[in-house]
Amino acid sequence: MATLSNFEIPFYSKNGWLAPLDTYISGDPGFDQADILKPMATSLTGSDGKVYGEPFYGESSFLMYRKDVFAAKHLTMPANPTWAQVATLAKEASGAQPGMRGICLRGQPGWGEVLAPLTTVVNTFGGTWFDKNWTARLNAAPFTAATSFYVNLVKSYGEPGASQAGFTECLNNFEQGKVAMWYDATSAAGSLDGAGSPVAGKVGYAPAPVDLTKSSGWLYTWAWAIEKASKHQSAAWKFISWASGKGYIQTAGQNLGWARVPPGTRTSTYSNPSYLKQASAFAQPTLTAIDSANPTNPGIQPRPTPGIQFVDIPEFTDFGTSVSQLISNAIAGQISVSNALSQSQSLAQSAGNKYKS
């Protein structure tokens, strides 16, 4: 058995490394595959239409903000904010409390750090890493506009030390009252509104900001898969059926607390009265964010692979990390955005050339 994400499963399955789960699913009606959130199920399905993974954790992204700070400054969060509106709000919220900055955005190097939120901005600004013919588009106008916007926003109204701030640093900044807004993973809500959080009850949740698209949240899930070479596939499925099943959600809620159950996996979780009682502030915004995510068509132009905040090829972990370092350097003011993207274009095209027909 293996624990994989929706990044690896599409190409692992294509390479023949994973066993399809469809036979096990059909023979286990109690598992209730139809209850798995559709975007998660889609992202764990191979190009052959077969299921290769079952989620045990899932997330999208949304905008978190301090309701009390907004009220004190007479600011209003739109129901579906645009990035232009968020930039204005970040400016107006900066300094709302001593030392408070308007927004926290990841700047830490890593294909799963700064590139996750940045790529959602690129998508909604009309950009893409590659066109459908594997021509890199990092120095094209939409990608440049999105990156310039992101870098300028975090430099102008973002957290101190932004070039080294990842999820954990932004979580700490938001909890400690150092920022008024934070765009990041829906999973953060469980900490922000959890018992003992200094901002519990003070946080509002809005959809991922947009520009040219209707939605822009990312999609990520950790999942169980079965290796094709396994000699114990039936036993592996029994574990998966338990660990990703409805019963596990119930057991976790009763023993650990409902706010700590695995998020983003099953539709039934979001209609469970016990869960909603503890997660009422963020349950519906989380479900809406996940349901709105479109991993096969996240932008406004065709692209060669699925994936919202990543390019779904093995090489992305390498060239993506190199690109992220250049973006982080731009946030730190060490190089210009145009210089960063010029170098990034070459890195991406070198990887894309392998896939050109």
What residue ranges belong to the model's regions?
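Conserved C-terminal helix/tail region of periplasmic/extracytoplasmic solute-binding proteins
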Residues: A71, N294-S357
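Paired acidic/hydrophobic, glycine-rich loop segments that form the ligand-binding mouth/hinge
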Residues: M1-T3, A180-A185
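Short, solvent-exposed loop/beta-turn-alpha elements that line the ligand-binding surface or hinge
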Residues: D22-I36, A79, I103, G107-G110, ...
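Short helices/loops that flank or line small-molecule/ion binding pockets
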Residues: N15, V69-F70, A87-G95, T168-W182, ...
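C-terminal lobe and pocket-closing loops
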Residues: S187-V199, L212-T321
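Hinge/lid segment of periplasmic solute-binding proteins
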Residues: N6-S60, Q85, V114-P117, A200-A206, ...
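Glycine-centered hinge/linker elements that transmit conformational signals in sensory
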Residues: L89-E92, K132-Q164, G204-A208
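Short helix-initiation/N-cap motifs at beta->coil->alpha
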Residues: F7, P81-A87, G161-E175
